[in-house]
């Protein structure tokens, strides 16, 4: 009788452990206050020489419809010869986060091609850009402070 109870207890504990581990890896996605995350990232990135992009610019540069995203923030350089850029996105789904990441990769590659041959400083910044996907958030940064912005982004999550 004790053996049966002990065996049953082991099975229940194992089942509980499996449920706990599954919950950790497949639980609900983290959600943070986007305005706070944006502020923390923006503070490190800075806004001097930058302009905020609208939904039309987001679509033109990334092929992404801003109305389909949960939240987004885009900064681009005021100077056409500068490549500094920041895109912070809260996506509505994991699939969408992957699409935004791919769009950021394509944007970086397009910019490299645009500046190849006559803009070595710009190409170097693009080579060192940060594209970070932390479901449901995506960060794209082209800046001398890209790693610092990434750190602020990860800390804010």
Map each language-model feature to its residues:
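Short extracytoplasmic/periplasmic juxtamembrane "stem" segments immediately C-terminal to an N-terminal membrane anchor
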Residues: 36-53
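Structured, soluble extracytoplasmic/luminal domains of envelope-associated proteins
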Residues: 80-126
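A short, solvent-exposed beta-edge/loop patch
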Residues: 121-157
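N-terminal positive-inside, membrane-proximal cytosolic segments immediately preceding the first
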Residues: 1-7
């Amino acid at each position: 009788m004790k053996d049966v109870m002990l065996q049953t207890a082991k099975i229940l504990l194992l089942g509980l452990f499996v449920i706990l581990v599954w919950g950790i890896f497949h639980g609900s996605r983290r959600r943070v206050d986007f305005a706070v995350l944006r502020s923390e990232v923006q503070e490190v990135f800075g806004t001097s020489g930058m302009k905020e992009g609208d939904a039309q610019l987001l679509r033109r540069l990334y092929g992404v419809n801003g109305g389909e995203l949960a939240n987004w923030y885009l900064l681009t350089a005021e100077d056409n010869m500068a490549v500094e850029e920041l895109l912070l996105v809260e996506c509505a789904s994991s699939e969408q986060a992957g699409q935004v990441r791919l769009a950021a990769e394509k944007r970086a590659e397009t910019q490299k091609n645009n500046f190849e041959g006559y803009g070595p400083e710009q190409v170097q910044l693009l080579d060192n850009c940060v594209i970070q996907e932390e479901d449901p958030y995506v960060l794209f940064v082209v800046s001398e402070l890209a790693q610092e912005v990434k750190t602020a982004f990860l800390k804010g999550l």
